[in-house]
Amino acid sequence: MLTIKPITKTRLLGYKRNYKHYPKTRLELIELIIERILSKGNCCDLNDIDVSAITDMTNLFNANNALRSFDGDISKWDVSNVETMYNMFTNSKFDGDISMWDVSNVTNMVDMFYGSSFNGDISKWDVSNVKTMKYMFTYSKFNGDISKWDVGNVTDMCGMFQSATFFNGDLSKWNVSNVHIMDDMFNGAIYFDNDLSGWNVDKVTNYDNMFNHSPLMTQLEKQPKFAHRNIV
């Protein structure tokens, strides 16, 4: 359970000045964010918080209602040392600019935008070290361009766009040759109708219900060429 220190008048006054903050742990960072939201509102600027020492951003904007309401500025955060962004924006209202984030060391993006309002530009993200994108955009409003993402190291895409009812991006050039799991990947993605027939799915072992309740369920010519068909 998350334990937050009492918010004192002295600590709140610190946020009214231009102090630089250097949290060393995820919990310290969460505490700082909550205090800032309570003192300056959910659209506040958090760029004066130096997050360069943080390696784990699990549940960062999902730990409580105040965090989920955040929609301020974190565009200049140095996230270059972060390794996991699990559940980072799950069910959050955040839709700010994070286009220039360096996510090159992140390996875990499970549930990152699950159920979130985010639809910003992340087209230039370097996701080449990510291993799992399981449920990354499930139930989200995301419909951005991620056509040039290097997903060559991803092994699990289970439910990645499940019930992502806004998404219809071009993924035709993705290198999914190391993916093993695609169960429910587009299940309920009611507008997704792009051509995936060129995907190399030789290593995929699980792909149950991959296109359930999506246009590709009946557009067989756009589906990847699985050795054993079981995609209903």
Range-by-range predicted roles:
Residues L2-V232:
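Negatively charged
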